[in-house]
């Protein structure tokens, strides 16, 4: 007997020629228990009434679903003991989360050991929380007066929405559009720049990397955690969980089912620096 529940992904995927009733009947006949991303009880009721799907078949799926819900305790007493509130968001757990963020940060480049910066340095910000940065440095609104730039970037993506799933995820090209790249390079060339890039996907940024004095790979860490690293409150220990490609050409030419095979990656899988003593 099947253990668990069979759930289908969203969209028609190859049966776009069938109407909605035919699709649902085909899905259920294939052994599916839940329609992922859909709420179609009226369609299922009509299929049973018309005899296209038997009530016995529906009961099999209902049994599987309810069994898992009972296992999870979803039908038990929904009221928690008030003393259990102390478990949620307690300081010990919060510190575990902060430590995970610290350990995830990857120092990719540190030219002439520019990092860590000295506290009280004059910095120009782009993408960072100003109030958090003021705890470490003098934040300048003028590039001319700044000693360094601290720049935060996100991995590029394309805003395609032809398919439903694309609306929920960043996808498409991994390199910066030429206009945006030119703007960033113009900024970076004015002062020594510490570039922090959020690597939700493996970004392609060789020119920005070359012109930056320091580069940090970030995985959605809080600004104060990143600033702790920049100003030497802890040493970086993170390693890249994937390689960073050197070009979009390398991305397009690599094999989709073979890891770490892009040509001349900018940074290899597992790369990561730390501060010198």
Placement of each model-derived feature along the sequence:
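Short polybasic/polar patches that bind polyanions
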Residues: 28, 49, 70
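An alpha-helix initiation/capping motif
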Residues: 59, 63, 91-98
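Terminal amphipathic helices with adjacent charged low-complexity linkers/tails
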Residues: 53-70, 75-81
